[in-house]
């Protein structure tokens, strides 16, 4: 349950072919489809056990997205470039409440080793959780114990993804400029997605936290913005559904998921399922400039 009546609506164009700088998604749908995709991909994965853990976490996210009480949208910077980047301490209280619900639901579904991890996380102080949450959102993954990151991010994701669509409807998208971080919450993308709506071949970056998508011109590095020295890699098939775009300028890379060719793909699940592509690019001296909510690698591990 939530309240948004106090936020004025900004009218937009009605053209179905208009290029939308921002695309809102329904978090319930995203989490439900992600859980299904994880279940499907686990069948042929050497990481089947981890895929199953992630599936259970995402399934709980879907339930929380549908049933949790999110209160009222807190003061947000509608005049700021990134409106949901600084929500204050009340937001911490809400996502930490979601975290406790997530851990309680997950506890009976895991083995004893993982249960000990969950119980330890449940015992952390609000101040500690606030510090860890802030570090993760700022990309400082190494400041948070790796065994806790998946669950903290999952809880924050439920909260931020709930409010993002409502904020997107209420900002002037004409002021949104191309950028490498999410224009709504300021977090890194998971990967690029190539879509067929409103026009075929458009690229959007998909946010790792609030699940929003924002347009980004193809053949430009999604990290440094350079339009020279980018290479599109495809290791087995030139028309593969997952490819990688690397940049010779900053030596970063991002995956490109051609969801127009395979609508069942999910940006987080399919990124996780193609870690061998990351290994290939790492061996060539490139590093990921993205964040996967299901695999929050420490900076030194990227």
Curated annotation (Swiss-Prot):
Classify the source by domain of life. Answer: Bacteria
CC annotations in GO: cytosol
Cross-referenced Pfam families? FdhE_C (PF24860), FdhE_central (PF24859), FdhE_N (PF04216)
Membrane-traversing stretches: none
Alphabetized, the UniProt keywords read: Cytoplasm
Q: Where in the cell is it found?
A: Cytoplasm
* Family to which this protein belongs: Belongs to the FdhE family.
Q: Which HAMAP family does its entry note? A: FdeH (MF_00611)
| Name of this protein | Protein FdhE homolog
> Which species expresses this protein natively?
Shewanella sp. (strain MR-4)
- Organism taxonomic ancestry: Bacteria, Pseudomonadati, Pseudomonadota, Gammaproteobacteria, Alteromonadales
């Amino acid at each position: 349950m939530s309240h948004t009546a106090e936020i004025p609506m900004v009218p937009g164009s009605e053209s179905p072919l208009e290029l939308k700088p921002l695309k809102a998604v329904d978090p319930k749908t995203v989490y439900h489809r992600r859980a299904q995709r994880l279940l499907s991909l686990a069948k042929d994965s050497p990481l089947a056990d981890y895929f199953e853990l992630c599936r259970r976490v995402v399934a709980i996210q879907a339930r929380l997205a549908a049933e949790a009480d999110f209160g009222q949208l807190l003061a947000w910077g509608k005049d700021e470039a990134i409106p949901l980047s600084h929500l204050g301490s009340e937001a911490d209280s809400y996502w930490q409440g979601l975290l406790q619900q997530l851990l309680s639901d997950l506890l009976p579904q895991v083995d004893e080793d993982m249960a000990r991890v969950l119980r330890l996380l449940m015992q952390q102080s609000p101040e500690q959780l606030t510090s860890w949450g802030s570090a993760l959102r700022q990309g400082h993954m190494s400041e948070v114990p790796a065994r806790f990151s998946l669950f903290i991010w999952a809880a924050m994701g439920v909260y931020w993804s709930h409010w993002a669509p409502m904020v997107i409807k209420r900002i002037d998208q004409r002021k949104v400029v191309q950028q490498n971080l999410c224009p709504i919450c300021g977090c890194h993308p998971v990967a690029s997605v190539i879509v067929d709506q409103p026009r075929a071949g458009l690229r959007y970056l998909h946010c790792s936290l609030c699940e929003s998508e924002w347009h980004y011109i193809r053949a430009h590095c999604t990290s440094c913005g350079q339009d020279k020295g980018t290479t599109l890699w495809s290791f087995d098939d030139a028309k593969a559904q997952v490819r990688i775009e690397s940049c010779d300028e900053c030596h970063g890379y991002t995956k490109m998921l051609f969801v127009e060719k395979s609508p069942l793909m999910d940006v987080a699940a399919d990124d996780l399922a193609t870690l061998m592509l990351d290994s290939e690019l790492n061996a060539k001296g490139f590093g990921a400039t993205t964040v996967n909510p299901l695999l929050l690698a420490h900076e030194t591990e990227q």
